[in-house]
């Protein structure tokens, strides 16, 4: 079905989405998905405006526009809604109608039926999807700006005119420059260093016992900083650009993301996932940079780690894809970011007939790169050895189009601001060859860009 009310307009003037988001009057449930690193992965930036439907999962409860729904589950409602509301997108843009939002790691844990031994210390929904009437989309490759309205909250032409007028007014506005003032921060980890190293040793013991082959071990940092979340976001996107970043502003919490990792992209029934395993910091000189890149390229430990996750992701996709369609398209690729190198693989397949995003999510979430193999047992070990719940960290943030397509990241390099504190998870994959000191130091390297942005 094609929504005949939908209007898509290319603006005569190119205005970056980051500037528009910064200077437009804020709205409740504001979400900005940001491709600040423009490459083959970072192509579009998306702003949602005029929300009309909010789906939330809070533990075992499901809410539609803040009203509890008891007659159907979140997953079944989403599956049914996507089937009933399926709408063609005739444009080249990633979506013309649909939702932006997130799924937390805790959503995935409950989806897998794994109980937690930890108390809730942070109160946010496990999953949020917000369907918007209007979108502002930047084609970061072509440097073009688009407005889309669907005529749900008010006539599409009227809403388009309002948005266009508001945006054109911003073209003369100077965007607020990233804050240069340095803020003191205090960082509190939920592990002492030696305790974290012991948990890694315990995880390695489980590997030798045959319980697991690989698992992801993380620690949680709580940071006290007076810097505003939106200032953190704009500093982070400037100094550590990423293809899958974002800023999500909800009632009592905000999410700042600079993820380099794609979890799921679904395009006309074709599924892609790109797990990351293997990290090296960037060098301070060109010579050191090249040495560290080569070190990662030649690391048998990191390649072995990634291969195990590739096998897991292939198995997950085979549950939901057409027989024989799942293939490894990219085995060991080095991706460069401002502070680190990553080792990445690509796995693709064709979604089985009569399946949609809800089925894909249930078959694959949470991602294998941030859990381990076998997934269920690895997640049990994670709950036993980590010192608290992960909450949003290692979940997914992205968009869901009503034409059936989607693109979701892995929520790493992601900080949650709630009740005046920032919460940051950092971790890495553990194998039989892991060295506890190296793994601990790697978590600090992964935290560096966000800790810098918080100052």
Predicted stretch roles:
Residues 1-455:
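Extended alpha-helical targeting/anchoring segments
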């Amino acid at each position: 079905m094609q929504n005949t009310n939908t209007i898509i307009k290319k603006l005569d003037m190119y205005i970056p989405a980051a500037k528009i988001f910064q200077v437009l009057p804020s709205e409740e449930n504001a979400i900005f998905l940001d491709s600040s690193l423009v490459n083959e992965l970072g192509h579009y930036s998306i702003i949602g405006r005029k929300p009309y439907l909010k789906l939330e999962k809070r533990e075992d409860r499901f809410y539609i526009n803040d009203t509890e729904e008891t007659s159907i589950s979140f997953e079944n409602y989403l599956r049914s809604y996507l089937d009933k509301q399926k709408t063609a997108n005739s444009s080249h843009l990633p979506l013309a109608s649909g939702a932006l939002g997130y799924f937390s790691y805790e959503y995935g844990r409950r989806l897998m039926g794994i109980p937690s031994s930890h108390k809730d210390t942070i109160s946010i929904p496990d999953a949020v999807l917000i369907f918007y009437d209007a979108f502002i989309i930047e084609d970061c490759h072509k440097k073009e700006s688009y407005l889309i309205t669907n005529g749900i909250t008010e006539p599409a032409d009227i809403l388009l005119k309002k948005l266009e007028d508001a945006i054109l007014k911003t073209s003369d506005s100077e965007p607020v420059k990233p804050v240069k003032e340095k803020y003191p921060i205090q960082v509190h980890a939920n592990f002492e260093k030696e305790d974290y190293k012991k948990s890694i040793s315990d995880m390695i013991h489980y590997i030798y016992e045959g319980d697991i082959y690989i698992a992801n071990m993380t620690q949680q940092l709580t940071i006290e900083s007076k810097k505003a979340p939106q200032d953190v976001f704009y500093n982070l996107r400037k100094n550590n650009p990423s293809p899958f970043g974002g800023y999500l502003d909800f009632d009592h919490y905000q999410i700042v993301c600079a993820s380099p990792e794609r979890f799921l992209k679904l395009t006309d029934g074709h599924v892609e996932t790109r797990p990351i395993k293997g990290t090296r910091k960037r060098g301070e000189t060109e010579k050191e940079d090249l040495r560290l890149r080569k070190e990662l390229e030649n690391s048998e430990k990191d390649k072995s780690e990634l291969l195990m996750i590739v096998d897991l992701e292939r198995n997950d996709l085979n549950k939901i894809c057409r027989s024989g369609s799942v293939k490894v398209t990219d085995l060991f690729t080095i991706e460069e970011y401002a502070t680190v190198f990553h080792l990445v693989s690509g796995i693709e397949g064709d979604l089985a007939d009569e399946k949609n995003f809800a089925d894909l999510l249930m078959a694959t979430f949470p991602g294998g790169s941030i859990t381990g193999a076998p997934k269920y047992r690895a997640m049990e070990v994670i709950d036993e050895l980590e010192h608290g719940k992960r909450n949003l960290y290692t979940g997914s943030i992205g968009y869901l189009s009503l034409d059936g397509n989607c693109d979701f990241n892995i929520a790493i390099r992601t900080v949650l601001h709630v009740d005046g504190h920032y919460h940051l998870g950092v971790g890495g994959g553990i194998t039989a060859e892991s060295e506890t000191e190296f793994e601990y130091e790697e978590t600090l390297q992964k935290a560096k860009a966000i800790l810098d942005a918080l100052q």
